[in-house]
Design a protein with these regions (language model features):
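Phenylalanine-focused residue identity feature
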Residues: 3-5, 19, 37, 52, ...
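Solvent-exposed, acidic/flexible segments
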Residues: 16, 20, 76, 112-113
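C-terminal/domain-edge helix-coil "capping" segments
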Residues: 90-164
Length: 164
């Protein structure tokens, strides 16, 4: 995942730190379907049954260039990710929900590496200058992750029973 790792993979980089900060700010205080609230700052208290942690796991990326005509190219950046809920009391993943994101733009010239990097950066940080996307001032990935987390039922525990 060259673009993802190059942008947010180095934990000590400014971009990675900024991305995590933006994610924490968006998550703070959001209510889930089960009535619980997300907190990026408060620590869970296991004795009170606060054992869940929610994570975003990016599994795959794909940058695709398509020639539509002599003077039009399509550039798309896809990310496959999973929302994971981990129960610390049970030491188990209790929920896993896939999400797929695609950013798509049209260019009048063959896309350059700079264009590809720019589209990947928009996925993680948005297009504040509104050069390519008028309505995407913040991170597309964070926005869609938060929508999915809030629309997904996350249980405290998951029980599987197999009958033979």
């Amino acid at each position: 995942m060259p673009y993802t790792f190059g942008i947010i993979g180095d934990e000590d980089s400014i971009k990675s730190t900024t991305f995590r900060k933006n994610l924490r700010e968006k998550a703070e205080g959001k209510q889930l379907k089960n009535g619980a609230f997300l907190s990026a700052n408060a620590q869970n208290r296991l004795k009170r049954g606060q054992a869940l942690a929610v994570a975003l796991a990016i599994e795959r990326e794909r940058m695709l260039e398509t020639k539509l005509s002599d003077d039009e190219y399509q550039l798309s950046f896809d990310i496959d990710a999973t929302i994971l809920a981990f129960n610390f009391s049970e030491k188990a993943i209790v929920s896993s929900h896939p999400i797929k994101l695609t950013l798509l733009t049209s260019l009048s010239e063959k896309p350059t590496e700079n264009d590809r990097s720019k589209l990947a950066n928009i996925m993680f940080f948005g297009d504040r200058e509104k050069e390519w996307f008028q309505d995407l001032s913040g991170s597309y990935l964070i926005t869609e992750f938060m929508k999915a987390v809030q629309d997904t039922e996350i249980r405290q525990a998951w029980r599987s029973h197999i009958r033979v």
